Structures are given as C-alpha cells and as structure tokens.
Amino acid sequence: MKSLLKYFFAISLLVLSGCSQNASTPFTTNSTLNSSNAIFDGDVNDPNSIAFFKKNVGDRVLFAVDQSDLDQLGKNILLGQLEWLQANKDYKIIIEGHADERGTREYNLALGARRANSAREFSVSRGIKSSRIQTVSFGKERPVELCSNENCYSENRRAVSVVSNLKF
C-alpha cells in the first residue's frame, strides 16, 4: 500500500510541475493571422491585386458613435473602392459591419448591419451592381482593438470591405 501511495505521489508531482510552466508560444493577433493571407492576396504593387486594394485603396470606413451615416472621408474611401471594383469586374465584396464593445450584443449586431448597408447602398447608388456586394454584421464580436478608451472604440466602429473572387 505504501509503495502505491509513493507511486501516486510521484505521478502527481510530475503532472503538477508540468502545469506550472509558462506557455512559450505568444498570443497570436488577427494581424498576424491576416499576414499569412498575403500569399493569396497577390503583389501589393499589382493594381489588380487584393493586396493593392487593402494597402492603397483602403478597405475600411469608420463611423461616429451610434451612427451609420457616412462622413465625407468614408465616402471618399468608398469612391476609391468603387473605382477599383469598376476596373476589376471579376471581384465581389462582402461588407462587414462592426461596432465597439459598448451596448448589448443585439444592439451592436443591428448597428453593424446598418453600417454595412449604408456602405452597400452608397456603392450601389454609384453604379456597382448589387449582385457584387453582400453584407454581414459582426456587431462587437470581432474588435480590431482591445481596450476601453475612445481610440480603441473609434477603430472598432467600422465597415470593412473584404474583396473576393468567389461566387455568391
């Protein structure tokens, strides 16, 4: 019985000592994950590539608190996107609507939908076929900044245009 108890004690120590070590793998952020997609996005110097779109045209529009109306800067960014889409007719976009962490999940999903639809309606009114644009709302579920101050909140209040060559 004593040998069984010693054996159990030794195994317990090994298990516990393995749990007390710090993880050596750092936390991976979305930007790190997204950088792996650069291979598929093409060359940033190719004006017909998704990488060019993201870097030079701009893929996001920011919004004021509790607003879904586009300001002039947002309209200008969307006009640049529309020009790129007119030159690259094989691509479609999915506009993701996002919100900051304040408010309920339901409210922020609805606000994200209004933001995505605002960008979509602007794009369609300027000549992009509605069949080339889909919208989705993530509300506050996918923040790009994780802190509780206005700088972070403002980056999370956005509509992001994700370019795709897949059929809807």
Per-segment meaning from a language model:
Residues 90-98, 113-144, 157-168:
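A non-catalytic structural micro-motif
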Residues 15-18:
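C-terminal motif of bacterial Sec signal peptides marking the signal peptidase cleavage site
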Residues 73, 77-80, 106, 114, ...:
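Extracytoplasmic/secreted proteins, especially bacterial periplasmic and envelope-associated proteins
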Residues 3-10:
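Sec-dependent signal peptide recognition
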Residues 151-155:
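A generic structural micro-feature
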Residues 146-149:
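Short beta-alpha junctions and helix-cap segments that line functional grooves
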Residues 20-92, 166-168:
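Periplasmic peptidoglycan-binding/tethering modules of Gram-negative envelope proteins
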